[in-house]
Structures are given as C-alpha cells and as structure tokens.
Amino acid sequence: MKKNNKVGHGLSECTTIVVGGKLTGDGSRIFARSEDFDAMRCKNWLVFDDTENGPEEFVADDSSFRCPLPKKRLGYTALPDYQYHHEWGSAGFNTAGVGESSTETIFSSPEALKHDPYVENGLAENCTYNTVLPYVHTAREGVERLGAMIEKYGSAEGFGIGFIDDNETWYL
C-alpha cells in the first residue's frame, strides 16, 4: 500500500464549527474554531476593562487601515499571539456577554474577485476583533457593525467571523 504523505503533513487550515441548539441534547449552541497559526507562538490572554475614555482611533500595525472608534468601550478579553499585542485578538467575550471568534481566512475564486475585489487598505481580519467586540451588546449588533465596516472600508481579504450571545449565533 502506498503511503500518502500529504494527509496530515503540513496541512493546516482554520476550521469553524457551528452547532445549533436543536442539535445538542440541552439546547446549547456551540461556536468553535481551530487555529492554523504556528503552535510555537504562545497566546496572551488579555483583559480590557470597560471605559468611558477608550482610544478614538484604531491604527493597524501591519497595514494602512485606520478607523474611528467610539470613546465608550465595553470590557473584553482577547487571545492575540504574543507578538501581536493589539491585533489578532482571535477569540473572547465582552462584558455584555457577546462572544466573537475571528481570524478565519477564506479564499475567493478569481472569478468572484472580478465582481467583488479586495480593497488594498480595507478592513482585514486581524483588525476586526478590536474594532467590533468592544462596541456591541448583542451578536446581531456584532454582525451588523462588521457588515457596516466592510461596506464603508471594503475588505482587504476574505475572512469569516462569528458572534454568539445568549439568544443568537451569527456568522459572516
């Protein structure tokens, strides 16, 4: 039997799993994502407090993306890789009980990109976490804020983002 050296060797993609409440025994909803980034880069668990005087602008560390932010910010947790302290928050919850899982890269076909191209200085996946989660009170608000940001700034790449709260689960 010929051994297939490609399976499980060097392949790694972020994968999102969404399970609705009708599929679990107790009605729980599950939203989870694997990570394909280097396992040797440790995570920081960051905790940010609620504030009335937060940053008024987000400035990306690795692109020219910037956007204004509301001064009032909910507290939230984030799990960035240690070398990206202010970006790539990836997953956590805010003090309103909204959870966000972000940084799942999605690739589009060349044909799709002809009709809906990426925007060089648009919103990228590494910027979504700190510009959305601290400012929303429901999962629905999360997907609405993210969608409005994509409409305003365009998207620099393809990505999938999930939001969950006590009542709803959303994936964009």
Where are the regions that the model predicts?
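Conserved short alpha-helical segments that host acidic/polar catalytic motifs at enzyme active sites
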Residues: 134-141, 145-150
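A structural signal for well-ordered alpha-helical segments within the folded catalytic domains
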Residues: 126-127, 140
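A contiguous strand-loop segment
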Residues: 2-124, 145-148, 152-158, 162-172
